[in-house]
C-alpha cells in the first residue's frame, strides 16, 4: 500500500492542543502543527529555524535582564548585576555604569519605559531613571520633580492620625524646627518638609523632636501649626515600590510605609505632583 503525503505550507495557528488531533474540519487544525520546536513562525505562514546563540560576555553573579526599546530598530539589552549595569546592542557591550542596587535587590526592581527614559524603583533605594541621548550616551540619575517658585512638587503625606504641631526659628536661610511629639529619625536627613506654603530640606536631626534645615521656599510664618507634611518618599519612610504610565500620567504604586496608596502626576507632566488649590 502506498503512503500518501501532502505539502503543508501554513503554520499560522502554531502548535495545536492534542485535543484537536484528528479534527480536520477545523481551520486551526489545517494551519497548525502537532509540534513546533526551535522554529520561528512567520506572518505569511512559513517557518524557519531559530537563530543560534553566540557568546558575548560572562554574567557576573546574580543578573537581571531588562529590555530597552527606543523604537523597532533601536533595541538594547540592559544587564543588571551587583551595583553594575551593562548595555548591549547587537553583539557587543556599548556602555557600563555603576548602579545603586545590590545583587539581592535586583529581582525587587520594578520598571517602566517612555521613549528614551527607563524609570526604575525599589522600596529601599531612591528611584532612578536610565536615559539614552542621541549619541548613545547612557546616564543613571535621580528623578527630578517639577519645581516652580522654589517649591518642589513631589508627593507629600501626613503620616500621623493626630498630627503634631511644628514651629520654626525663622523664615529663610538656615533654621531649626521643633515639634511637640516624637517625629524625627536620623534617616530623615536629606528629606523635605512642606511647612504651610514653604519648603525646608532637613540637614540635621538633633533629636526626635528637633531638626535643623535649609529653607528652600521661604516660610510665611514661624508659629506653631498643624499645616505641614513630609515628603512621601525618603530613607525614613521608604521609596516607591512600583511605577507605570496611564493616560499620559506617571503612576506610583505604593511605598514601603504606604503600600496601598497611589500617586498620579498631572497629565502630560510626568514629574509634577502638584495637587492644586
Regions found by a protein language model. Name each.
Residues 1-93, 129, 133-174, 219, ...:
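N-terminal beta-propeller domains
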Residues 126-135, 182-211:
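Ser/Thr/Gly-rich low-complexity blocks that favor extended beta-strand/coil architectures
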Residues 82, 115, 172, 197, ...:
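Residue-level signal for tight coil/turn positions that link beta-strands
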Residues 80, 99-128, 250:
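Elongated alpha-helical scaffolds
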Residues 107, 190, 200, 238-241:
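Generic recognition of flexible, low-complexity loop/linker segments
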Residues 91-97, 200:
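Surface-exposed loop/edge segments in extracytoplasmic proteins
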